[in-house]
A protein has these predicted regions:
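Terminal connector regions
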Residues: 293-323, 713-765, 823, 845-866
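N-terminal carbohydrate-binding accessory modules
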Residues: 312-378
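Substrate-binding clefts and catalytic carboxylate motifs of secreted carbohydrate-active enzymes
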Residues: 26-27, 33-42, 61-67, 111, ...
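Extended acidic/polar, glycine-enriched regions
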Residues: 173-177, 245-336
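Accessory carbohydrate-binding/adhesion or oligomerization-edge regions at the termini
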Residues: 20-97, 179, 183-189, 327, ...
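Substrate-binding/catalytic cleft of secreted carbohydrate-active enzymes
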Residues: 385-563, 595, 599, 614, ...
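Beta-strand-rich binding/interaction modules
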Residues: 144-146, 239-275, 281-284, 663-700, ...
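Accessory beta-strand-rich segments of carbohydrate-active enzymes
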Residues: 33-39, 69, 79, 83-86, ...
């Protein structure tokens, strides 16, 4: 079932009927009301009483933050448009500052606690059962009341990344109305809460609220929790040892004897257990050997086989409690090589990490369909990893990454109280440790989760690291762990083997292969990028008022980042220096898409060519928390830009590429199988498309390898702006891929001495202004649709009918000839070139429902397309 926290229910106060969908869980998502404690005189015992009648409260659905619920109730204008966010009371912190590190303004409506209240009726079938009230995340503290009695106090229910469960059996009323009231206390600058660092602004409530699911679990006298499947492989994956764990708790006043049973695939195992009165214990089941197991692999490297595990405790001839989950048989490991670089392996195979940093929605609204679309976008770009810096996401996210074969590297966030260990009090260490424990318990069974970073920009102090490592050991975390996203060494974990040396602003495409000291293509760069990513016009029109679309002004800057990234000045200077000064908004946008295409392609290509001297790179970022002009591969409205398709091109599994450092042509194979008899061809063209060089070669490509085929020589008589076109065919002559570069005889020259962790300035720009002289051309497009379930696939044929190059040809699918574009659309290719007369076929896949009944229309535009 898809739940979106912004889908609030406008219903009258009353009792919401509840039932357990599977006999063991009752969701409390609907029928909530919220109000500021400043407007409520009563205390928790009265508010959670059945006679209390809320007046003037706001309807809500959980999970939701306070601000998200108020926005849904139209109390404030869309905070994501223009500078509307600044109009919400309490948003007085300096633009570009990290609000998480500042106190809440005293006059902010969110400086006080807010009440969440719901009334629900429990089914009579739960009578005689144990009832457990669960909160999967509360930001940040809470006093919890049920039916007039306090279930938990704020010193107990505390911690954004904690998961809480309370025995409500003696308070609940089966077959009758129940009232739950939660007083949520906002986080302060000295709490272990969520932060968006310099990525984007923060809502004025600091995301306070019930921000994950609230539900009731039903069990017999013995509850079963924290089921875990641990897999170890032998003989190159031909044998898997699977060990199962579960936590049992006897709530009865006397001893209970029973049987713990587990089953997956064709394996069944059981164990007799005796639990004394009120005893809690962890049970390890006998290890099971599985011969020739179906292993889990990332997408493109093998199947995403998952195994369904059912665990239950039976006593007195009845099932007291059960849990079910899917797990993957796979084994991750890592090592720090002789150069100090961390290299990850999966099932005994090396893997180059190609990833992007993820952000949750700024108001922590969750949408299952959107999540799946975004993960599919990542996979479509041939990325294999998503990094979560403090944005742990919900269960659906991890279930989806398991199914899609997308690796996940979660960890804590930087630049907040999480890294101010010198100020931590004893309770902070407790909260941090229990936060890690709860997150590890929910992450460890997911095949896609392969590492945990218990530090971000910095490694924790010795005391915090001891707390973290103790938790990882106790919870059977067998995946790798790293103490920081930056280069560091700690007593408990040794060297991190990674770097966090930038850049984050625009750098020249040749930077990645020429740099030897900072962010270049060596080692594992945990967060880096070629800087801003300007959205296309349609997105800018949705995020900015018309009068602020051009020129770039404070509205643009508000949708940039914070700290040192509050504008796009570095990017714009490079754009004008390389492509020529923008004549207007459309000119700026076409040049932006070209520059982000070549920038992202260059970064990923460099790490691909240099594997395994380069062991990983994480693009900062994959997506944004709100509409932004920096750090994404597709924008808030799910429109992919030039950076998306540059990334997709660079990371294709078998890829031919040009090297900016030595002019070599290389083939990069990411498959765990080789290919023979492949034909590589390279052509060099002047701006007017006169051919200046041509060469072909036949190569054999080993599994997961790189072959440098030949070099393109320096040559005389080139136009200042010129082109290189590469093609790759298989042994039967079938096209595998192609690649197209626009280059200059005047290369970019970086000012290495002035470089820093933010960026390395360019002192001489490549001259690509010749592109402005490309003659206008017409590109003809025809398409035919094919239905595949709920999806439609457009087979699009485009042809350049002009006599000049068609540059950066861009396709969109629209709702009829004059309708809006639809997104997400998964294009086989986009922002490509067409030679005069050239014809190309590409596919576009999308959900048919996005058309809203209209007839799809493929629209063509481009750099010089009429």
């Amino acid at each position: 079932m898809t739940r979106t926290s912004i889908a609030l229910l406008a219903i009258l106060p009353g009792v919401f009927p509840c039932r357990a969908a599977d006999g063991s869980r009752i969701d409390l998502a609907k029928g909530w009301w919220i109000q500021s404690s400043a407007k409520v005189a009563e205390k928790g015992d009265a508010i959670s009483g059945g006679k209390y009648a809320p007046s003037g409260w706001y309807p809500a659905a959980v999970p939701t933050t306070v601000v998200a619920a108020l926005v849904q109730n139209k109390m404030y204008p869309d905070p994501y448009f223009g500078m509307n966010l600044r109009s919400i009371p309490g948003t007085t912190y300096g633009i570009g500052t990290n609000f998480a590190n500042l106190p809440m303004p005293a006059d902010s409506p969110f400086a006080v606690s807010w009440w969440y209240r719901t009334a629900f009726q429990l089914p009579t079938s739960v009578k005689g059962k144990r009832l457990w009230l669960n909160f999967d995340a509360i930001n940040y503290r809470a006093n919890i009341w049920l039916n007039g009695r306090q279930v938990a106090k704020s010193d107990e229910a505390v911690g954004m990344y904690r998961m809480f469960e309370f025995d409500m059996t003696d308070i609940a009323l089966p077959g009758a109305a129940n009232t739950l009231a939660v007083e949520v206390i906002p986080p302060t600058q000295t709490d272990l809460t969520i932060t968006y660092v310099d990525w984007n602004p923060m809502p004025p409530d600091k995301d306070m609220g019930l921000v994950r699911d609230v539900y009731i679990r039903v069990s017999g006298p013995v509850s079963l929790r924290n089921t875990q499947a641990v897999t170890r492989l032998e003989n190159h994956g031909e044998l898997a040892h699977v060990t199962l764990y579960a936590d049992l708790k006897n709530t009865a006043a006397s001893a209970v004897e029973g049987t713990l049973k587990a089953a997956f695939d064709n394996v069944a195992v059981s164990k007799k257990v005796r639990l004394e009165a009120n005893q809690s214990t962890r049970i390890a089941m006998p290890a099971q050997d599985v011969a020739y197991p179906k292993l889990w692999w990332p997408y493109g490297l093998g199947a995403q086989d998952l195994h369904h595990l059912r665990m239950e405790f039976e006593t007195g001839g009845a099932v007291s409690d059960r849990e079910e989950l899917d797990f993957g048989m796979r084994e991750f490991a890592s090592e720090v090589d002789a150069e100090g670089h961390r290299l990850f392996t999966l099932n005994g195979k090396k893997i180059l990490i190609r990833g992007g940093g993820w952000s949750s929605d700024m108001m922590l609204r969750y949408d299952d369909e959107r999540e799946e679309n975004e993960i599919r976008y990542a996979r479509d770009m041939h990325l294999n990893t998503i990094r979560l810096e403090g944005k742990m996401m919900n269960q659906h996210f991890f279930d989806t990454t398991d199914r899609y074969g997308m690796l996940v590297m979660p960890g804590w966030c930087c630049c907040s109280y999480w890294e101010r260990w010198r100020n931590w009090k004893p309770d902070d260490y407790r909260i941090a440790g229990e936060s890690l424990r709860d997150q590890i318990r929910r992450l460890r069974n997911h095949a896609s989760v392969f590492v945990f970073l218990y530090g971000s920009d910095n490694s924790p102090n010795a005391e915090a690291e001891k707390v973290y490592l103790k938790v990882l050991e106790e919870e059977h975390w067998l995946n790798p762990y790293v103490s920081s996203a930056a280069k560091a060494t700690t007593p408990g974990a040794g060297p991190t083997g990674v770097k966090m040396t930038g850049p984050y602003e625009y750098v020249a495409p040749n930077y990645w292969l020429l740099d030897r000291t900072r962010g270049g293509a060596f080692g594992f760069n945990t967060e880096t990028s070629p800087g801003p990513a300007i959205p296309v016009l349609q997105s800018l029109e949705e995020m900015l008022p018309k009068e602020h679309l051009w020129p770039i002004d404070e509205f643009w800057n508000f949708h940039a980042g914070g700290g040192g990234y509050r504008n796009v000045n570095v990017f714009t200077a490079a754009l004008e220096g390389r492509y020529g000064k923008a004549a207007d908004l459309n000119d700026y946008l076409r040049k932006s898409q070209a520059m982000t295409y070549e920038g992202e392609r260059a970064m990923f290509e460099a790490f691909g060519r240099n594997k395994y001297a380069a062991t990983g790179v994480v693009q900062w970022m994959l997506n944004n928390a709100w509409p932004s002009i920096i750090w994404h591969l597709y924008d808030w409205y799910l429109r992919p830009g030039g950076g998306y398709f540059g990334t997709k091109k660079a990371n294709e599994p078998v890829h031919v590429q040009y090297s900016y450092d030595d002019r070599s042509v290389a083939v990069v194979n990411s498959y765990y199988r080789g290919f023979s008899g492949y034909k590589v061809a390279a052509k060099v063209y002047n701006l007017d498309l006169t051919e200046k060089f041509s060469k072909t070669a036949t190569v054999d490509i080993g599994e997961d390898s790189v072959v440098r085929v030949f070099e393109i020589p320096e040559m005389e008589g080139l136009s200042t702006t010129y082109f290189v076109r590469l093609t790759l065919q298989d042994s039967a002559g079938k096209p595998v891929t192609s690649n197209f570069y626009w280059l200059s005889t005047q290369p970019d020259v970086s000012d290495w001495a002035a470089g820093n962790g933010r960026y390395t300035p360019i002192k001489t720009y490549a001259d690509l202004t010749g592109l402005e002289k490309l003659a206008p051309v017409k590109v003809k497009a025809t398409s035919r649709a094919e239905q595949k379930g709920g999806e439609e696939v457009q087979q699009v044929t485009v042809q350049n009918t002009g006599s000049a190059l068609a540059f950066m040809v861009h396709l969109t699918v629209r709702k009829g000839p004059d309708g809006a574009d639809i997104n997400p659309v998964y294009w086989e290719d986009n922002y490509f070139e067409l030679m005069p007369g050239e014809k190309r076929e590409v596919t576009a896949t999308y959900q048919r429902k996005l058309l809203s009944g209209a007839k799809p229309q493929v629209k063509v535009d481009g750099w010089n397309v009429q």
